[in-house]
């Protein structure tokens, strides 16, 4: 019995038709692990940074018609919410498990906060080859950093700084069949390794 990880069939919750039925599927197959990951990694971030982190599991409460295409747990230092702060996320679409750190378009002082990525441009480029960027958290697209030109990356960061709807996340994503999802031990190791790469950007 696993506590933290997800099986390929869990991702099929996103194929269930209808809002109520999909929410039931998420509650059964995905949210229990997100809550466990929330507890584990809020402690992890608190111990790594010396700041108190809180987990925020997506509730999808505002939805009245369209079922969610993704779900997540986010980590931030505000107990009431995470969108206004730089934050970490573990989440899922039907075809990927993603891990991210960055800034949403709703962030307070977004232009100032996003400059951490401008200042640490070289460090972004030096992340391992399987690291990506996400420029819109509502879409699954996450191009590999290694496939972006310097200008592409600079433009993406500038958009987060200067455009109201601009966002910037560094990210990592794996498929539902990935071997790192086969056990809790492998999954937690993958997540800790990823967050260890993200944390310097949080502290910078």
UniProtKB/Swiss-Prot annotation:
It comes from the Bacteria. It comes from Staphylococcus aureus (strain MSSA476). Belongs to the UPF0637 family. HAMAP family: UPF0637. This is UPF0637 protein SAS1041.
């Amino acid at each position: 019995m696993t506590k933290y990880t997800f099986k390929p069939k869990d991702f099929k919750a996103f194929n269930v038709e209808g809002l109520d039925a999909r929410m039931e599927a998420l509650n059964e197959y995905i949210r229990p692990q997100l809550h466990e990951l929330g507890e584990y990694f809020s402690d992890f971030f608190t111990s790594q940074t010396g700041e108190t982190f809180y987990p925020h599991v997506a509730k999808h409460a505002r939805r009245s018609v369209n079922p969610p295409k993704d779900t997540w747990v986010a980590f931030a230092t505000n107990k009431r919410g995470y969108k206004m702060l730089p934050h970490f996320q573990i989440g899922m679409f039907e075809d990927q498990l993603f891990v991210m750190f960055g800034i949403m378009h709703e962030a307070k002082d977004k232009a100032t906060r996003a400059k951490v990525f401008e200042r640490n441009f070289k460090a972004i480029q030096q992340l391992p080859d399987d690291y990506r960027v996400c420029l819109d958290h509502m879409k699954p697209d996450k191009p590999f950093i290694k496939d972006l030109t310097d200008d592409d990356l600079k433009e993406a960061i500038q958009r987060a700084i200067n455009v109201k709807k601009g966002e910037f996340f560094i990210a990592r994503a794996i498929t539902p069949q990935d071997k790192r999802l086969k056990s809790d031990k492998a999954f937690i190791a993958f997540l800790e390794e990823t967050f260890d790469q993200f944390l310097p950007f949080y502290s910078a």
